């Protein structure tokens, strides 16, 4: 009996020793939740969150920097109840239940909001908000879940915007990227405010204050965006906006706030890069080359953008009433092939050829029923010879195509196949060359892609790739047609399937601009330059241009750049050539280049061949004018550009590049 008692005491002593583990050794966040002076406090070792339960206002104390968010406001919750849209306020919930919340890997608060009312009407809805510190860096993870009963959520602004006195500048992936000082003298607006459009190529933004920074990273971006304001002289207000999906907020929405004691827009971009790598979204060019050797031929190659037939329908806003000859301009396939042969004689040994206007009635006409190839230009035989010429010259031949614009005179047009909006209407426009059009539901696009490219290959046309217009620049669509419903998430899946089909057929996949969702599906884009006022076609830059996109994805996708001054997406009075160099992108090449253009193209190609597969590790401004800048790549290569003096320096220097004419 005595021996048994000794043994039992030994076991108890051993268990006590083994369970006395330091909290820091478990990986469990060392975070405490408590109430203090009427506020809820979430305290970690680095960061402290204060929540005022009366107005849901939050303040974050992050290692010496305070980030204050605005309070709940009227309209931060929009619902539909009995067919009416109602503006509510989260903080006006008749009942707020706030309790500590701990999952073992994140710790904070759960806030359950119920008993909403609008005038004398009770709104049957529950909103649950979660605020937690997570991970060693104690990032603030905010999650919103709606339990919709008789009322549905149309949009919600939460967490609220960071107050203007908490930051000096705002960082936005507005096209390639924008740094916007709070007191910027000119009005700034985003072209669109939904994720995956030009306003937000990538689903994040951030703010800088002195040497500190905060990143707002949307982890569920498909039905999300922002509200953005910057009047003349500022200040800037940028706020997260959650959007319904087919009329409901039907899945949890999550955003992560990352705090940097010492950091700026480069650190934000690198944190986001780590995020897309961790979730498997980042697909490098090296991986794409491994999957398709044709992609390797694009590294260090110029991009030749040319066309066959430009035909403008009378209904189009581009129609030339006073000069009808401009409405139908044709160059044959054979003529274009000869121009490529002459270009090759100037020393161009490889290139990516993007061909517009090859379809039956030319550029932006009759989609998705574009076959047969333009009869006036040579038809099937002419297109086949053009493709063979590209093969012989070592050029990668790809066609321009479109599977969103749905022309009313297309052979397959049926109004029942268009997008149906929530209010029961169908989109209609007549801007583009083909005239009257609607929008094809994304669920139906893949069948047309298969139809057309299978036919091209069956006719012996050696097309090596395709550019599917607008897919990677227009935010995702919704469709409410019960025959082919599609959420925004569905839309992106269907667009991706179209691009993946091209790659499965051995082709290079391309689209218009580099919206983040498309990175795993495409190899290059038409361009990814900067936001200008009043539009990207021409004008001064909005804010200060910075290469946010390339800081994340330079080694995942190829971006071509126009060379001229004030070209599309290039700030007026600045050389596209210098922007192309500092971004180490591909150059555009005209069909009849002079010596200066050829020299510029060869320099850009040589630089891209050196670093095109490498990460852009750094971007920096070298003086207060923001005109002298430097980028650094993973091998140590630096590119320094002075936009004022129109000079550049590449270090280490590129090998001597001589004329090959």
Predicted regions and their residues:
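Bacterial N-terminal signal peptides
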Residues: 6-13
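Short, Gly/Pro- and small/polar-rich lid/capping loops
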Residues: 25-30
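Carbohydrate-recognition beta-sandwich/jelly-roll modules
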Residues: 33-34, 40-353, 358, 365, ...
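Active-site-proximal substrate-binding groove within the catalytic cores of carbohydrate-active enzymes
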Residues: 44, 246-268, 316, 321-324, ...
């Amino acid at each position: 009996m005595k021996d048994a008692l000794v043994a039992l005491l030994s076991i108890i002593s051993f268990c006590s020793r083994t369970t006395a583990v330091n909290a820091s050794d478990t990986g469990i966040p060392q975070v405490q939740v408590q109430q203090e002076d009427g506020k809820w406090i979430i305290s970690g070792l680095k960061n402290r969150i204060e929540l005022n339960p009366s107005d849901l206002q939050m303040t974050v104390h992050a290692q010496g920097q305070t980030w204050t968010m605005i309070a709940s406001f009227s309209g931060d919750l929009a619902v539909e109840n009995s067919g009416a849209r109602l503006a509510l306020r989260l903080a006006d919930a008749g009942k707020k239940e706030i309790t500590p919340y701990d999952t073992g890997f994140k710790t904070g608060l759960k806030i359950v909001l119920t008993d909403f009312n609008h005038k004398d009407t009770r709104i049957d809805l529950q909103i649950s908000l979660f605020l937690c510190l997570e991970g060693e860096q104690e990032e603030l993870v905010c999650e919103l879940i709606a339990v919709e009963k008789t009322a549905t959520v149309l949009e919600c602004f939460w967490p609220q915007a960071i107050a203007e006195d908490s930051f000096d500048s705002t960082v936005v992936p507005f096209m390639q990227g924008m740094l916007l000082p709070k007191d910027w003298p000119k009005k700034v607006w985003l072209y669109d405010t939904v994720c995956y459009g030009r306003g937000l190529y990538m689903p994040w933004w951030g703010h800088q204050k002195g040497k500190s920074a905060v990143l707002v990273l949307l982890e569920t971006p498909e039905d999300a965006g922002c509200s953005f304001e910057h009047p003349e002289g500022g200040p800037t207000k940028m706020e997260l906006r959650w959007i319904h999906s087919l009329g409901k907020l039907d899945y949890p929405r999550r955003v992560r706030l990352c705090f940097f004691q010492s950091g700026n827009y480069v650190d934000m971009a690198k944190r986001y890069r780590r995020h897309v790598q961790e979730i498997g979204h980042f697909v490098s060019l090296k991986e794409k080359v491994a999957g398709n050797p044709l992609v390797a031929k694009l590294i260090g190659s110029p991009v030749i953008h040319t066309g066959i037939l430009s035909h403008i329908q009378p209904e189009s806003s581009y129609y030339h009433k006073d000069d009808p000859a401009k409405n139908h301009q044709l160059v044959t396939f054979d003529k274009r092939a000869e121009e490529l042969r002459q270009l090759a004689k100037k020393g161009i040994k490889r290139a990516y050829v993007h061909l517009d206007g090859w379809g039956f009635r030319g550029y932006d006409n009759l989609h998705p029923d574009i076959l047969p190839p333009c009869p006036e230009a040579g038809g099937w035989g002419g297109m086949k010879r053009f493709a063979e010429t590209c093969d012989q010259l070592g050029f990668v031949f790809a066609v321009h195509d479109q599977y969103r614009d749905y022309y009313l005179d297309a052979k397959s047009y049926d109004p029942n196949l268009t997008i149906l909006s929530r209010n029961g209407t169908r989109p209609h426009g007549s801007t583009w060359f083909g005239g009257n059009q609607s929008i094809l539901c994304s669920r139906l696009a893949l069948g047309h892609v298969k139809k057309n490219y299978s036919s091209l290959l069956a006719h012996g046309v050696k097309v090596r790739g395709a550019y599917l217009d607008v897919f990677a620049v227009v935010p995702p669509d919704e469709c409410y047609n019960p025959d082919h419903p599609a959420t925004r998430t569905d839309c992106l899946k269907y667009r991706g399937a179209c691009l993946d089909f091209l790659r499965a057929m051995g082709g290079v996949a391309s689209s218009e601009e580099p919206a983040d969702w498309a990175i795993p599906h495409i190899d290059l884009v038409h361009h990814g330059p900067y936001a200008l006022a009043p539009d990207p076609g021409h004008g001064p830059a909005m804010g200060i241009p910075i290469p946010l996109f390339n800081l994340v994805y330079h080694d995942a996708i190829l971006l071509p750049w126009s060379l001229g001054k004030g070209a599309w997406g290039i700030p007026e009075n600045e050389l596209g050539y210098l922007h192309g160099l500092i971004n180490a992108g591909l150059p555009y090449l005209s069909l009849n280049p002079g010596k200066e253009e050829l020299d510029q193209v060869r320099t850009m190609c040589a630089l891209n061949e050196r670093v095109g597969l490498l990460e852009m590790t750094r971007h920096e401004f070298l003086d207060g004018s923001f005109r002298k800048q430097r980028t650094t790549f993973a091998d140590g290569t630096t590119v320094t550009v002075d936009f004022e003096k129109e000079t550049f320096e590449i270090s280490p220097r590129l090998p001597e590049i001589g004329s090959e004419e």
